[in-house]
C-alpha cells in the first residue's frame, strides 16, 4: 500500500508519469552490481516529486525491490524525495509519502496494530505543516520500538522510552531555525548495541567534519546514518558494525551525486543511505558500502582445557557462560584462564565478532586496568624484602621533595600508598591518573605531561584528608610507587619488573598511541572520544582508549598501563598476592577497569584464574559481578587431574 497527500483526482496523472520518471537519468540510477555469489540490482533516486516517486516506488515494489533508504526534503509546496531501493527478498512492508502529521500518525498507529515496525521516517516543513514519509515492515526480531515526532528537544526522546534501552534507527530534523522539530525512531536494544548519535540544536551545533574525524578514530567505527536539515545541518549516527569498505559524502549537488554514485559503483561500493535538503539546488548526503547489510557475527572458541578429570565438561561449562554473556552484552573479545602452581590447566579465548576482526588466541594480550597494580605491589615487595624500602618510609622526603603545599604530604608513607590511605580522594577531586591533559592546559604546556611533572603538580595541591585517617581507592598511589621504584633502582619501572618480577612472563606496556595499536588483534572497544592527553595542543579528538580519557599509560604504567593474557595473569598469581604485597594469598582478588578493557584476577584454594574483556561498556556493573562471581568462578566443582 502507498499512501500519499495527493488527491485521487491526480491518480491518473501520477500513473502516467512512469515514462517521465525514466526520462530523468540525473535523478535516478538503476544499477547492477557484480557479486562473488551472483548479482544484485539497486535503484537510487533523488530530486523526484510526489507523483514521480509514487510511480517509481509502485513499480519497484512490483519488481521485487525493497527500501534501503527513504528521505523527504524541501518545502511543503514542492517536496522532493530521495531514496535507495534494492532488489531482494524480505518481510512485508508498506510505505507512506507526503502525509501531514494527522494522516501519518493514523497510518502509523494502524500498521503498528497489525504488527508492523517503523523502519524509516523522514519529515520536512514546519511544525504546523510538516509532511512525512516513512516505511513500516513486519520485522519479527523487533518486539518493541518507539517513534516520537514533533519534539522541540531531541534529548526529550529519552523521556518517551521510560529508561527502556533503545538504539536509534533514524532522526529527522525539520522546521525553521529556532523553531526546530525532531522525529526520532528507536528500536529496543536487547544486545547492548553500541552507537553514538549527535543531535543538532540551535544552542549547540556540531561540526560534522570534526565528528567524522573523531568517531572514525575509533577502530571499526563508521557513519551509518546522516540526516540533513533544510539549512544543511547534518545529524549523524555512528556505530562499530562492519560493512567492508565504506565512503561518506556530504554537500553534494545532484550532478556531483550522480558522478559519485558512478565512481563508487566502479569500486563495487553501493549506496546504503541517502538524505537531501532543499527543493531547488538540492544538496545530498550519501553513504556507500561494500556490503548492503552489516556482517553477521560469528562465535569462535580457541584454547584448551587440560588439567581436570572432566576437561570436556569444564570447557563446555566455561564456553556456555561466556557465550551467553558476550552475546547479550555485545562483547567481541575475551579470555578466561586458570592455573595450578603456575601451570595453566585451562585457557579459552572467545570471539563474538565479524569476519574482519581477529579471532582471539590464548596468547593475545588485553589491557589489564588496575590488575596492573599486582606488578607494582610485587616490585614493592622485592624492595621491602631487600631493605631498600620499609613500610614507614616517607615518600616525598625520600624523593627530595620537602616543601609541599600541604605539610601533611610529608607524612605519606609507603604503607599509605599500598593501603590507599595517603590522603587523595577521587570523589572530591578528579582521579589523578586521568588529569594529564588538564595539567598541561593549566600550565599552557604543549608537550605531554610526564609522571614527574604530574607528581610535582599533585605535590603543590592540598590533601583531601590526613594520611592514615581514611581509605579511598587511588590510582595515584601506585603511580607514585612506580616512580619511587624507578628512583631507587636507577632504571625504568618497566625495565625493573621485567628483570626482577615477571620471571619470563609475557607482560608489556599497553601504549597510548592509536598508531601503535592500529594492528593490535585485540581492539580496545569504546564509544567515547575526547582530546588526547599525549598531545595537549591537538584539536582532534581520539578514542578514550588512546588518551582521550586524560591518561597517558606510559606514565601510569604502575597503576593501569600494562597488558597481558589471562593465562599469564593466572600464572603470576601462583607466587604473588592478588591485592596485597607478599606471596600468594588464597581467596583474594583484584578487579581492573579502564576504557577498552575489564579484567579480573583471583586466587582460590588451589586454582588461580583470570577473566579479561576488551571493553567495559557492557550492560551494567551488576552483569559484570554476576559473571565473575557466578558459575565461571566455581572451579571447586571440578576435580583436578591427578
UniProtKB/Swiss-Prot annotation:
Catalytic reactions of this protein: a glycyl-glycyl-[protein] + H2O = N-terminal glycyl-[protein] + [protein]-C-terminal glycine
Glycosylation-annotated residues: 37, 100, 159, 341, 390, 407, 444, 487, 494
GO cellular component: extracellular region
GO molecular function, one term: serine-type endopeptidase activity
Entry-linked InterPro entries: Bact_CellWall_Synth/Modif, Beta-lactam-related, Beta-lactam/transpept-like, PGH-like_rpt
Annotated family: Belongs to the peptidase S12 family.
Keyword Signal: yes
Name used for this protein in its record: Polyglycine hydrolase
